[in-house]
């Protein structure tokens, strides 16, 4: 497996729709308009967070059960920022829609800007031939409220290309998150 460069990412996005919408350079903004960077980097793509969030709340004193998740455990927010309560988490989605090639596995890592503030981004790998908006999980590990900015960079995708195609892709096995749009809750 080899990690793919900015040239490969640009070509795959422009010719094969791997990332839509696609930003072909790294955007940082200037002066008072600085943003947390997004777009193509040397060996990855920095994704943006959309403006729709689901913030975890325990007002119903529920038990968190991944096999029987209660949608009422979240408060829906549509905003340019999301405040995550101390020691809690929120779900969001990427602005970008991904179409992963059959011979590629994509790994997501959080941006250091958030990590240095105690905000951890978690995403499972994007498997071969998976497509959809990526659901992002933000954990606030601090004892203070934490802010997430919509339409700015939140994580970096790294594309690993195999020297051979897999026998069975995510699409082949009818993965339960195939084609997801919006913030997607757990499915079993």
Curated annotation (Swiss-Prot):
Pathway: Pyrimidine metabolism; dUMP biosynthesis; dUMP from dCTP (dUTP route): step 1/2
Keywords (A to Z) from UniProt: Hydrolase, Nucleotide metabolism, Nucleotide-binding
Catalytic residues (positions): 137
SUPFAM superfamilies, sorted: dUTPase-like
Example GO BP: dUMP biosynthetic process
A Pfam family reported for this protein in Swiss-Prot or TrEMBL: DCD
Subunit structure: Homotrimer.
Family: Belongs to the dCTP deaminase family.
Its job: Catalyzes the deamination of dCTP to dUTP.
Stated name of the protein: dCTP deaminase
């Amino acid at each position: 497996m080899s990690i793919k460069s900015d040239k490969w990412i640009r070509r795959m996005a422009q010719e094969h729709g791997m990332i839509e919408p696609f930003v072909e350079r790294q955007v940082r903004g200037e002066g008072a308009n600085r943003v947390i960077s997004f777009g193509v980097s040397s060996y990855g793509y920095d994704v943006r967070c959309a403006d729709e969030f689901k913030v975890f709340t325990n007002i119903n004193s529920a038990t968190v059960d991944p096999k029987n998740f209660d949608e009422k455990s979240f408060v829906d927010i549509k905003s340019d920022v999301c405040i995550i309560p101390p020691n809690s988490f929120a779900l969001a989605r990427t602005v970008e829609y991904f179409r992963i090639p059959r011979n590629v596995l994509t790994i997501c890592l959080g941006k250091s800007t958030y990590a240095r503030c105690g905000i951890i981004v978690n995403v499972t790998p994007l498997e071969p031939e998976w497509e959809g908006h990526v659901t992002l999980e933000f954990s606030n590990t601090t004892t203070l409220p934490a802010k997430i900015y919509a339409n700015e960079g939140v994580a970096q995708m790294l594309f690993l290309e195999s020297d051979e195609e897999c026998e069975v892709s995510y699409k082949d096995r009818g993965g339960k998150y195939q084609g997801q749009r919006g913030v997607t809750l757990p499915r079993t």
